């Protein structure tokens, strides 16, 4: 089957609706929608939930942009894309909870197609989800990775290990020499064996996010926390900001293509702190995080 961008777009719009409804039901607060247009072509729907019962900020963004020429960030590694028009669409979300015992979560699914007359289209899917805890709980990590493995299983025994490793490699702060969190799944440039197979997998990842995350939220939301835990959460959120602004390809692509800055930076935590050369107290729960986020096989 030839690539069907319209079909993908309809799924992504439904996915945004489903995730927002699910998160709102858990939190009790509603998302505010901001529809926007891109002068160079396309637009999107940005939805943000602020200061809810559980989530300090949750952003779920749909975007569909198109243009006559590829940006430098895309053609640098793929010269075959030069001179092609393109469409890029996706749903991207980040959830920052109030409670430091609830991890931050991120998910993204996307589709890209570039075309020119007289040539076959160049297309691929990408996406994944990853978890960033502030205090580590093994049962949460096992559940997160088991959900990821189970959704990958129908697509082959090698899919979960491959995309888990890719996630571990991608969400790594080189300047800190540390992982951003405990990973999950990350895939990109997926275009084999055919469109239907790849689209099915992207849908499985998108639909699997809430199954992976919400049981963890339910387990941790009633845990009591105070100023110490909050300060550590804000400090660790700094790593999130550093990764997104320095290393994340999606952020750089969005800014280089003239994307909507407010939507691109919606992933940023609402509050964050840096402290020069801060070190956790030896033997403390905060000190245990550095070991907890080391790459390992959770299941």
UniProtKB/Swiss-Prot annotation:
Residues bound to a divalent metal cation: 96, 106, 145, 175
Protein name as it appears in the record: Oxygen-dependent coproporphyrinogen-III oxidase
Annotated pathway: Porphyrin-containing compound metabolism; protoporphyrin-IX biosynthesis; protoporphyrinogen-IX from coproporphyrinogen-III (O2 route): step 1/1
Gene Ontology cellular component list: cytoplasm
Coiled-coil intervals, chain numbering: none
Annotated positions for site Important for dimerization: 175
Active-site positions on this chain: 106
PROSITE patterns hit by this protein: COPROGEN_OXIDASE
Enzyme Commission code: 1.3.3.3
Residue sites binding substrate per the record: 92, 108-110, 258-260
Function as written in the Swiss-Prot or TrEMBL entry: Involved in the heme biosynthesis. Catalyzes the aerobic oxidative decarboxylation of propionate groups of rings A and B of coproporphyrinogen-III to yield the vinyl groups in protoporphyrinogen-IX.
One Pfam family per UniProt: Coprogen_oxidas
Record bears the keyword Oxidoreductase: yes
Family, similarity comment: Belongs to the aerobic coproporphyrinogen-III oxidase family.
One GO BP annotation of this record: protoporphyrinogen IX biosynthetic process
Record field: catalytic activity: coproporphyrinogen III + O2 + 2 H(+) = protoporphyrinogen IX + 2 CO2 + 2 H2O
Localization in the cell: Cytoplasm
Subunit structure: Homodimer.
Keywords, ordered alphabetically: Cytoplasm, Heme biosynthesis, Metal-binding, Oxidoreductase, Porphyrin biosynthesis
A Gene Ontology molecular function term of the record: protein homodimerization activity
Alphabetized HAMAP family for the sequence: Coprogen_oxidas (MF_00333)
Region: Important for dimerization, residue numbers: 240-275
Names of required cofactors: a divalent metal cation
């Amino acid at each position: 089957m030839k690539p069907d961008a319209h079909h993908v777009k309809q799924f992504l719009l439904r996915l945004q609706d489903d995730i927002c409804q699910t998160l709102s039901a858990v939190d009790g607060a509603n998302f505010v929608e901001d529809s926007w247009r891109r002068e160079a072509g396309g637009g999107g729907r940005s939805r943000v939930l602020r200061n809810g019962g559980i989530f300090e900020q949750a952003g779920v963004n749909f975007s569909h942009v198109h243009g006559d020429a590829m940006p430098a960030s895309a053609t640098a590694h793929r010269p075959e894309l030069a001179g092609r028009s393109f469409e890029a669409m996706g749903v991207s979300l980040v959830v920052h909870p109030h409670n430091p015992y609830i991890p931050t979560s991120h998910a993204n699914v996307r589709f890209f197609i570039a075309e020119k007359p007289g040539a076959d289209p160049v297309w691929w899917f990408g996406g994944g989800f990853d978890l960033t805890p502030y205090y580590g709980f093994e049962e949460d990590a096992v559940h997160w990775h088991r959900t990821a493995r189970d959704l990958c299983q129908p697509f082959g025994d090698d899919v979960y290990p491959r995309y888990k490793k890719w996630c571990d490699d991608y969400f790594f702060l080189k300047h800190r020499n540390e992982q951003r969190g405990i990973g999950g799944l990350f895939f990109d440039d997926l275009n084999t064996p055919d469109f239907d197979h790849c689209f099915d997998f992207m849908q499985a990842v998108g639909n699997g996010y809430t199954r992976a995350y919400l049981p963890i939220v339910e387990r941790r939301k009633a845990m009591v926390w105070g100023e110490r835990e909050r300060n550590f959460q804000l400090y660790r959120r700094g790593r999130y900001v550093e990764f997104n602004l320095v290393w994340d390809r999606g952020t750089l692509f969005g800014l280089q293509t003239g994307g909507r800055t407010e939507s691109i930076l919606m992933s940023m935590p609402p509050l964050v702190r840096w402290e020069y050369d801060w070190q956790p107290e030896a033997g403390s729960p905060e000190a245990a995080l550095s070991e907890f986020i080391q790459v390992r096989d959770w299941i």
